[in-house]
Curated annotation (Swiss-Prot):
This is Co-chaperonin GroES. It is found in: Cytoplasm. InterPro entries: Chaperonin_GroES, Chaperonin_GroES_sf, Chaprnonin_Cpn10_CS, GroES-like_sf. Heptamer of 7 subunits arranged in a ring. Interacts with the chaperonin GroEL. It holds the Pfam family Cpn10. GO terms for biological process: chaperone cofactor-dependent protein refolding. Together with the chaperonin GroEL, plays an essential role in assisting protein folding. The GroEL-GroES system forms a nano-cage that allows encapsulation of the non-native substrate proteins and provides a physical environment optimized to promote and accelerate protein folding. GroES binds to the apical surface of the GroEL ring, thereby capping the opening of the GroEL channel. Belongs to the GroES chaperonin family. Keywords: Chaperone, Cytoplasm. SUPFAM superfamilies: GroES-like (SSF50129). The keyword Cytoplasm applies. Disulfide bonds: none annotated. GO terms for molecular function: ATP binding; metal ion binding; protein folding chaperone; protein-folding chaperone binding; unfolded protein binding.
């Protein structure tokens, strides 16, 4: 599937949270909160003016409860508005 965001939207691939502690203890998916992590990699950008400073490959922090989830096989993506991106991780 080839997904191209339109306007002020961004296609994100969420980054899964580490599923074990620093000491090596494995966590269950419920205790690790993998569904609520709000960091992602930018996969594609629309052509909106608000997207200045964001590029494909950037890691970003986005509003936790924003966007629409899309699945392509086993991979989950989010389409979010540019206003829902809070910061770029350097």
């Amino acid at each position: 599937m080839n997904i191209k965001p339109i306007g002020e939207r961004v296609l994100l691939k969420p980054i899964k949270k580490e599923e074990k502690t620093k000491s090596g203890i494995l966590l269950s998916s419920k205790s690790s909160n993998t569904d609520t992590k709000n960091e992602a990699e930018v996969v594609a950008l629309g052509k909106g003016e608000k997207l200045e400073g964001i590029k494909v490959g950037d890691k970003v922090i986005f509003n936790k409860f924003s966007g629409n989830e899309i699945e392509d096989g086993d991979i989950k993506y989010l389409i979010v508005n540019a206003d829902d991106i809070l910061a770029v991780i350097e």
